[in-house]
Amino acid sequence: MRKFASGATRDSDEGKNDYDGFLSYPVLEAFGDYMTVHRKQADGKLRDSDNWQKGMTQAVYMKSMFRHFFDVWALHRGYKRVDKKTGKEITKKEALMALLFNVQGYAHEELRKGKK
């Protein structure tokens, strides 16, 4: 039990998840920026921000995860990567955020299995 100078009390935070310590603000902000840019679909329509939570197969996430990991790996090794659709150079930040999206999506589907 914690007691504060004001007289307020609160349970101990022992054993509770410390999201403030576990998560990185700059990474989450970069991820949000990445997701905002990629909300626009090929047909020009804007998809809902939680569209991915409707469900995709883990195989889809895995294939994409491999492609984006390959980009991260190549960039890490000093190679240049170019998006074959747009011709734009892929940055390490973009490749990492794409990888993070797919890891999160794969994990989301894995955790949903236990709730069905």
Positions of the model-derived regions?
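Intrinsically disordered, low-complexity regulatory regions
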Residues: 1-116
